Amino acid sequence: MNMQMADVQTRPARTAPTYAPAIDTIKEAVRRAEQRIAPLWPLRYFVAVNPYLGLIDHSFESAAYILARRAGARMTAPRSFYAQAIRSGRITDADLEAALAGGSPFPGAPANVAALKAFALGDEPEPTFPILPTVADAARKVTGINWADVVTDLISTWAGAYFDLGQSYWRSPWKHLPPYAAWRAEAAHDRTPQTRGVHGFRQALREMPESAMETIVAAVEKLNIPINGLEAYLHRLLLSIHGWAAYARYLRWDAELYGGEDHTLTDLLAIRLVWEVALWHSFARKGVADVWRSMAGEYVNDRPDPALQRALAGDLLLQRAFEKAYQRQFFAQLGATTPARVAARKRVQAAFCIDVRSEIFRRALETVTDEIETIGFAGFFGFPIEYVPLAETRGGAQCPVLLTPQFVIAESVDGASERDVNAAIEKRAQNQRVAKAWRMFKFAPISCFGFVGPVGLAYVRKLALDTLGITRPVPHPATFGLDAHTRERVAPSLEPRTLGGRTTGMTLEQRVAAAEGALKAMSLTNNFARLVLLTGHGSTTVNNPHATGLDCGACGGHTGEANVRVAVRILNDPAVRAGLKERGLIIPDDTVFLAGLHDTTTDDVTIFDKAHIPASHTADLKRLEADLAAAGRLARAERSMLLKIGTKTDIDSAVRRRSKDWSQVRPEWGLAGCAAFIVAPRDRNAGVVMNGRSFLHSYEWRQDEGFGVLELIMTAPMIVASWINLQYYGSTVDNRVFGSGNKTLHNVVGTLGVLEGNAGDLRVGLPWQSVHDGEKYVHEPMRLHVMIEAPIDAMTAIIARHEQVRQLLDNGWLYLFALDASGKVTHRYIGGLQWEEC
């Protein structure tokens, strides 16, 4: 960036424009506009992201107005949704009154309950704000052609080829260049703009500088963008290529996380601005400059219609009333049960991810037996690792995307000699090379024709088996290239060694420190059971581009298998336990840790590394597996109602069949419905039926000296939970802008994302089928309700120290409540580091 800035200051003089803002002012507007874009992770580890992330410095209401003007986006459900809730009695007059008490930043908002009900139940039209204009809109006005869509399609076609991660076999010849340079090189040969009628494209390309930042400065001057509206204009342009801008924002996020930098987003903005200049040149004779001059004034004089402001204010009040109704109903359940007395020692302690899907299974397991205590913790279980599969030198980050891996753990083969391990590595690598060559033959542009004729019929049997769910359409990447014998023995290796020039494994001191941190963060420091099961989670689906979005977000879009297997090997290590004992943390000799994986699609739990479990615990293990199987049946029965599986059907078979059905658009509901995040000991809410809508994090503040664990919870899991909640929220209230549309129309592009159909922008967020069942919302849009049992002063101090946390809370992006020792809600956070009694 510094080099680009220097280039801007030393560029050759041009004809003085009629409008020349300071270069530093333009750069700052670029920076702010780019920060407004939320990142989009690629499909290989598709994690939930708050789509409003770049606007959390604004209030929820202010962001609703900004996005309405810049993207034509909604931030509330259709008004009929709230009207139905009022008619059914779900939203009461008391809820409407409570919503009105919070006020509205917009003039003309309904002033009382009667007015708000009349607004909801009346026939006043939904607000449709005019979107801030671009030169493409001005060109449309003088030609009648939707140039904004044309430009988006052409940029998307180029981006799909340039950013391709391995799907295409004919790569862009300019892929080695930075994005803007690559686009310019291709555009110099491409005649598509001229054939589409943009005859000024080549002129624009010639007069624009070669660096992205220089181009942005030149275009801003050329188009006379009002300085007071420059950030809004640039943000508006980025939102016109929202998906690709979001992917570029991810590239920057990832680079900065590891101490680097990335300018892809700036390059994309420059590309979009060149198109603005090209359209300006192309239709100059049709008066586009005059039209643009009059339209650009909206960026300075943004005066919305009072009726539109009133409609927006009313809809936002109805959304708040809907959330007040949820609070009234849910809070009445909390504290209504008597906290269970914890036995001197439980037979099993089972720790699960805080994921809302775990709530149903945990409750089922507690129903099966009261001899098992369940615990909630982020699914990476305090072990932020990069896990490198066998025969690879790089792996995926198995931790929340807010963190970087602290350790590199490589796979090896249990019980094998170094020679045998190397042989297994070579065999897998060879199998992968053969498979890649065969795939290239099948899909390459020329050889594919020779493949279909002579070889196609040989695939009839596989096609039938895949359709029946007996086999997978493609091998699972975790086991691909391994023979059955090796597959059973592949496991993480903790011993330090060198792989690809990097040190893998963990020293004893690192293992002890990691174990201590994990156990304290779980509030698991005493009263250990004979068996302690650490249960990660993953999902089983086929033909699903967004499959990793159903895996563990706390594990970076991977399953939690690697984390729990690493954690268990460390916690069962006698040397580690000796080190923990020196630190005052004593694990009984008869306590054995187990690694398990909860399949959230089928509710089956797999226990790993059984060969390492001592014979003394064989009976305990057998009994636990029976309990887990029984809990799975209960959980499947509960979930079957939402999946619309009939009661006369064999539910277990039907659920498992869905997981293998490649025509199934809803194999499971994921985190749809997520609404609450509870941080407290489990006995405060045990027995409360939360319907898989609550993240449950175990926490005992009396054991948290200095409140370091509380600070970690409020700055990591709470943020991640809000990202998940707001992704579902955005995908529900406006799937066009914040979601990915109809799953049945998806086409994967570059293995990194999806298009809806064969053109248009890269899609962000969740498919419509992930939030709606075809008749009604399965995810009810509401902001996350965070409830924490901890001293209010401690929570307030943490909020004051962390700007992002304070912005989320003070600006109304999530709610925060305090719980007492009985699990009842006692206080709510009202902003400005202040609380009030509920």
UniProtKB/Swiss-Prot annotation:
Its cofactor is Zn(2+). It is a peripheral membrane protein. One of its GO terms (cellular component) is plasma membrane. Keywords: Cell membrane, Membrane, Metal-binding, Transport, Zinc. InterPro entries: DabA. GO terms for molecular function: zinc ion binding. It is found in: Cell membrane. The keyword Metal-binding applies. It comes from the Bacteria. The keyword Transport applies. Zn(2+) binds at residues 353, 355, 537, 552. Forms a complex with DabB. Belongs to the inorganic carbon transporter (TC 9.A.2) DabA family. PANTHER family: INORGANIC CARBON TRANSPORTER SUBUNIT DABA-RELATED, UPF0753 PROTEIN AQ_863. This is Probable inorganic carbon transporter subunit DabA. The lineage of its organism: Bacteria, Bacillati, Chloroflexota, Chloroflexia, Chloroflexales. The gene is dabA.
